[in-house]
A protein has these predicted regions:
Chain C
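Short Cys/His-rich Zn2+-coordinating modules
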Residues: 217-231, 249-251
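A boundary/linker detector
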Residues: 162, 181, 185-216
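Short linker/helix segments within small regulatory modules
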Residues: 253-263
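Short Cys/His-rich "knuckle" micro-motifs
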Residues: 248-254, 274-277
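General detector of N-terminal leader/presequence modules that precede the first folded domain
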Residues: 1-182
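Short cysteine-rich clusters marking metal-coordination/redox-active sites
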Residues: 241-245, 266
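Short metal-binding segments enriched for Cys and/or His
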Residues: 267-283
Length: 232, 258, 285
C-alpha cells in the first residue's frame, strides 16, 4: 500500500528581513511516510521543529525545499507546489489539522464551528449539526454550551471544540498538535477512542503528543525530528 | 467540472503622472472565493479595485469577466451601458462610506428594493417581502423598513448597504474597506455577518482592506500590495503566518495579535 | 382682427423655425427623448408657454386652424392671449372646437374629445426632465436616460406606496414611451395619461426655459409606470358635471360661496359646451 502522505527531503528555514535578513534553518532533509491507518508521533526536543513540520504539512508554512506528497482524489499531489485554490480543496477534502488553540470566530455558535467543515464538504446543514452535536456530547461538552460562541469557554472546553471540528469530517489524513494538552483523564480517554476509531477507518495520523501515555497507546512508531543548527 | 475564473486580470499597469499606481498586476478570482488585497494607504489597492471593476481604465493590461452565460467580456471594452447593467445585477459594490452606496433620503426598503426594481421587479408586495427578509438577514429590525438611513447608526447603515448589494444575488462583490469607519465592536459584528452571507451565498468577493484581522477572518486568499505591485500572494494563513517578503513581514509584525 | 405687419409669418424668422423643425424631427424619430434646441426670447415670460409657442410657430401654416387651451379652458387669460398672438402674427383662423382644430396648443390638459390622425397636440412644458427631483446632477440624468436605467423612478413610486398606501402622483405622472424613454407628460392630470397611449394625433412637447423638445409620434405606446399589484389608476372626482352631467370627463372643483358651497364642472369647456348644446337640441326636437 502506498503512503497517504510522505515527504521527500523536506526543508524549511525562515528569513527574518526585519532582523537584518537573519536566516533560521529549522528543517532539512525530512523524509517521512505515513500509511493509511497508521499513527506516527513526532518526537524530538522542544524547538526541534515538530510544530514547524506539522504546519508545513498543512500548508500553513510554505515548504522551503523538497516535496510533500499527499494522496488526494486518488492521485499523489505535491503540496509544496500546490497553489492556494488547490490547497483549499485539499484542506476541505483530505487533510485535517487540530491545532493547540482554537481560533475563535466572533459570534459563531460552537455547533456551527464544528459543523462548518461538514457543510463545506456538501453535507446538509441539519445533518452536519446533528453530527457535530453528537461529537461534542461525546467529548463531554454539555449541550447547553453548543449554541454559545466558544470565546468565553475554558482552555479545555475550547480544545474539545477544536477536536470535534477536526474529527467530524473523517479526513483521510489528520494532523494532531498536542490534542490532549489541557484535557482531564476522562476526556483524554475519549480522544484516545476517537484516534483509535479514526485509525481503524484508515486515517493516517501524524501527531505531537507531550502526553507520553497517550502517545504510547496510539502511536505505531516515533519519528525523530532533529534540531537544525540554528543561529549558527 | 470545468471551473473557470470569474475575473481574470493580466499585466495591469497604470501611472498617475510619474507615480506608478499599478505595475504588472495579474490576478484571478474564482467562483465562491474571497480574495483580500492588503497594503498600506497609497499601495495601489483601491486603484486596483477601481480598475478591476471597470471604473478606471488601465494604461496596460486587461480585465476579463466571465458572465453567467459563460461568455468572456473585456471589462474595459464592454461599454458603459453593459458595465452598469453588470454593476446592478451580477456585480455588487460595497463602499467604505455607506453614504456612497445608499440613498440617504430613501427608506431602507426603497434602498434594498432599488436594485430589484433596476433588474425588472415590478411587484410591490414581492419587493417589500424581499426587502423585509434582507433587513432581517442583516439584523436590522424589519419594523424600520420605512425609516431612512439618516436615522440609522453607522453600523446599521453599512449593514443596509450590504443588504442592498446582495439582494440581487450578485456573483462577484467588490468591497472597499467595508469596516473602515466603524467602532471595533461594530466591526466584529459586521465582519461576522459578511463572512456568514458570503459563505451562504457562495459569493466571490474582492476585498480591499488595511485591516489584517479582517482579511484573516474573511479571505481565503491574500494579495499584499506595495507601490503598485503585488509583492506576495497565497493562502491567507500562509501569507500571514509565514510571510516571505520583507514588506509583508513588516505588515504582519505591525499588527496587534491578528 | 388684422394680421400685424413687420413680423415674419408666425413671429419667428424662417431660420429659427427650420432649426426648431429639425429638433422636432429628431424628437419624433426618437420618441420620448429630449432634444435640445435654441430657445428664443418670446414676447412673454418663461412659464407662460414659450416652449409651446415656439413649437406651434414652427409647424403652423396659413391653412391650419388653431385651438389653445389652458387647464382645459379656451377662455382663460393664457389661452386667450396665445390664440390672439397667433391670429395676429400668422393670420390663421382659430377655433374653440377640438374636432375642428388642426393644431391644439395646451397647458395641463388633453381634450376629452378623442384626437384623430392629422391633428397635432402641442404641450407647454415647464420641466421636461422626469428624474429632476430624484437626481440633481443633469449629466447623470442624461446618463440614466442613455442607459435606460430607471430603477430610481420606481423607487419614487415605491416610496409613495410605502408612505401613503398608493402612488400619490396626481399630475405629471411619469410614463415610458415606446418601451424605451422615461418621459414627463407635462403637468397634465394623471387622468389624461391613458389618452396619450397610441393616440392617432402627433404629440409635441416644448420647454422654453429648459430648451428641450420631445415628441410622441402617432400610435406610439405610452405606459404609465406602476406595480403589478398597484396598477396605475386614472383618478377623477367622484361626481357628475353640474352643467352637462358628464361622469366620464375630468372635473374642476369650483367654490361657489364662503359657506363651503362647491360644484364640479368639466375642465374641458369645449366638451362641456358641446354636450350642453346637444341636450338643448334634443329638448328642442
Amino acid at each position: 500500500m502506498s503512503p497517504a502522505i510522505r515527504t521527500e527531503a523536506l526543508g524549511k528555514s525562515f528569513t527574518l528581513h526585519l532582523q537584518g535578513g537573519t536566516r533560521i534553518p529549522v528543517l532539512s532533509g525530512v523524509d517521512l511516510a505515513v500509511e493509511p491507518g497508521e499513527c506516527v508521533a513526532l518526537a524530538g526536543p522542544s524547538g526541534a521543529g515538530k510544530s514547524t513540520l506539522m504546519r508545513c504539512l498543512y500548508g500553513n508554512y510554505g515548504a522551503g525545499s523538497g516535496r510533500i506528497l499527499l494522496r488526494h482524489r486518488g492521485a499523489e499531489l505535491d503540496l509544496a507546489s500546490a497553489d492556494a485554490r488547490l490547497m483549499r480543496e485539499v484542506r476541505r477534502e483530505t487533510l485535517g489539522y487540530v491545532s493547540q488553540f482554537l481560533r475563535v470566530i466572533p459570534r459563531v455558535p460552537t455547533l456551527d464551528i464544528v459543523a462548518e467543515p461538514l457543510v463545506a464538504r456538501g453535507m446538509p446543514r441539519e445533518a452536519a449539526r446533528a453530527r457535530a452535536a453528537a461529537l461534542l456530547t461525546r467529548l463531554n461538552l454539555p449541550s447547553a454550551l453548543h449554541a454559545l460562541p466558544p470565546a468565553t469557554f475554558s482552555g479545555g472546553e475550547q480544545q474539545r471544540v477544536n477536536l470535534a471540528r477536526g474529527f467530524a469530517p473523517g479526513y483521510p489524513v489528520l494532523l494532531l498538535d498536542e490534542p490532549t494538552a489541557s484535557l482531564d483523564a476522562a476526556n483524554r480517554a475519549v480522544v484516545l477512542g476517537l484516534i483509535e476509531a479514526a485509525k481503524a477507518q484508515g486515517t493516517a495520523i501524524i501527531g505531537i503528543f507531550h502526553d507520553t501515555e497517550i502517545r504510547d497507546r496510539v502511536a505505531d512508531r516515533l519519528f525523530e525530528v532533529h534540531p537544525e543548527q540554528a543561529f549558527a | 467540472m470545468m471551473e473557470t475564473p470569474l475575473l481574470e486580470a493580466h499585466g495591469l499597469g497604470l501611472r498617475f503622472g510619474t507615480i506608478p499606481a499599478l505595475d504588472g498586476v495579474s490576478l484571478e478570482i474564482w467562483p465562491g472565493e474571497v480574495v483580500a488585497i492588503v497594503g498600506e494607504s497609497g499601495s495601489g489597492k483601491t486603484t486596483l479595485l477601481r480598475v478591476l471593476s471597470g471604473l478606471l481604465r488601465p494604461d496596460a493590461g486587461s480585465v476579463a469577466y466571465r458572465g453567467p452565460d459563460g461568455a468572456t467580456h473585456s471589462v474595459h471594452d464592454m461599454g458603459e451601458a453593459a458595465l452598469r447593467r453588470l454593476m446592478r445585477s451580477d456585480w455588487g459594490f460595497v463602499h467604505q462610506n455607506p453614504r456612497d452606496g445608499l440613498r440617504m433620503g430613501v427608506s431602507a426598503g426603497g434602498n434594498v428594493g432599488e436594485r430589484l426594481m433596476a433588474v425588472g421587479a415590478r411587484h410591490y408586495g414581492g419587493i417589500r417581502a424581499e426587502a423585509t427578509e434582507w433587513l432581517r438577514r442583516v439584523e436590522i429590525d424589519p419594523a424600520r423598513i420605512d425609516d431612512t438611513p439618516q436615522q440609522f447608526s453607522g453600523g446599521m447603515q453599512q449593514r443596509l448597504q450590504i443588504a442592498r448589494t446582495l439582494v440581487t444575488r450578485p456573483r462577484l462583490v467588490f468591497m472597499d474597506e467595508p469596516t473602515g469607519g466603524l467602532d471595533v465592536s461594530v466591526q466584529a459584528r459586521l465582519l461576522d455577518l459578511i463572512r456568514e452571507l458570503v459563505a451562504d451565498l457562495g459569493l466571490a468577493v474582492l476585498l480591499v482592506t488595511h485591516d489584517i484581522a479582517a482579511a484573516r477572518l474573511l479571505a481565503h486568499r491574500l494579495l499584499v500590495m506595495r507601490q503598485g505591485r503585488v509583492v506576495e500572494q497565497g493562502l491567507t494563513d500562509r501569507v500571514l503566518d509565514d510571510p516571505q517578503h520583507e514588506y509583508t513581514q513588516l505588515l504582519v509584525a505591525s499588527v496587534l495579535a491578528a | 382682427m388684422s394680421t400685424a405687419t413687420g413680423y415674419n409669418f408666425a413671429y419667428l424668422d424662417e431660420d429659427t423655425k427650420r432649426m426648431i423643425r429639425r429638433a422636432i424631427l429628431k424628437a419624433v424619430a426618437i420618441p420620448g427623448h429630449q432634444v435640445p434646441f435654441g430657445s428664443r426670447e418670446m414676447p412673454l415670460p418663461y412659464g407662460w408657454g414659450t416652449g409651446g409657442i415656439q413649437v406651434t410657430a414652427s409647424i403652423i401654416g396659413p391653412q391650419d386652424r388653431l385651438k389653445v387651451i389652458d387647464q382645459g379652458a379656451d377662455d382663460t387669460t393664457n389661452a386667450v392671449s396665445i390664440r390672439r398672438f397667433f391670429a395676429r402674427v400668422a393670420g390663421v383662423p382659430t377655433t374653440e372646437r377640438t374636432s375642428e382644430a388642426s393644431i391644439i396648443q395646451t397647458r395641463h390638459r388633453i381634450p376629452e374629445t378623442p384626437l384623430r390622425e392629422g391633428q397635432i397636440l402641442v404641450y407647454q412644458v415647464p420641466m421636461p426632465e422626469p428624474l429632476f427631483r430624484l437626481e440633481p446632477r443633469v449629466a447623470e440624468t442624461k446618463r440614466l436616460h442613455a442607459m435606460a436605467d430607471y430603477g430610481l423612478m420606481h423607487v419614487r413610486l415605491y416610496e409613495d406606496i410605502a408612505r401613503h398606501g398608493h402612488i400619490a402622483i396626481s399630475y405629471n405622472y411619469p410614463v415610458m414611451v415606446n418601451g424605451r424613454y422615461l418621459m414627463a407628460p407635462s403637468p397634465i392630470p394623471a387622468f389624461d395619461n391613458p389618452k396619450m397611449d397610441r393616440m392617432p394625433a402627433l404629440q409635441l412637447f416644448g420647454a422654453g426655459r429648459e430648451k428641450r423638445i420631445y415628441a410622441v409620434p402617432p400610435y406610439t405606446a405610452v405606459r404609465s409606470l406602476d406595480f403589478e399589484d398597484h396598477p396605475f389608476e386614472p383618478v377623477r372626482a367622484k361626481a357628475a358635471c353640474a352643467l352637462c352631467g358628464s361622469r366620464e370627463s375630468y372635473l374642476d372643483e369650483v367654490v361657489t360661496d364662503d359657506r363651503g358651497g362647491r360644484m364640479f364642472l368639466c375642465s374641458d369647456t369645449d366638451y362641456c359646451g358641446e354636450r350642453q348644446a346637444a341636450v338643448q337640441r334634443d329638448a328642442a326636437e
